[in-house]
Amino acid sequence: MAGTIEQKLAAQGVVLHEPASPVANYVGFVRTGNLLFVSGQVCVGPDGKLIAKGKLGAGVTVEQGNAAARGCAINLLAQIKAALGDLDKVVRVVRLGGFVNSAPDFLDGPKVLNGASDLMVAAFGDKGRHARTTVGVAALPSDAAVEVEGIFEVS
C-alpha cells in the first residue's frame, strides 16, 4: 500500500515508476547513517524517453527545462522508494544539485531547477525545502537537458 507522501503525489498526477538502472560503474543510491545520497537522475519519463533533449537557450525553453527538472525529481523519488520502500521515511530533503545542459549565454538555470524544487515542496511540505546548487554544463549523458542529484535525511 502506498504511504501518505505517495498518495499525495498520486493526487497530483505523479505516479512513480521503476527507477532507472545505472548506466556505468555506480549505484543509484547509497545510505550511510540517516542520510540517503541519490545519484544524478536525468529527465527520462515513464516511457523511457527524454522529457527534453538538448541545450537550454539553444532550442530548449525554460518551460521545457522546468518540466524536465520535475521529471528528474520524480526519478529521484523513485530511487528513494527503491532504497527505503516508503517515501514517508524521508525526514527532510537536505540538498538538490542540478545540472543544466546550457548554451554559453544561458543564465536561467535556477528557474529550470525550480521544477525539481517545487515538486519536493509539493510532496513533503516544509520538509521539502532544501539547499540547492544549479550549474550550467556543456553536455549531459544522452544529451539530456537536465540532471538532478539529491541528499535526503531518512529514518
Positions of PLM-derived features:
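Short, polar/acidic, helix-capping and beta-turn segments at strand->helix junctions
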Residues: 1-155
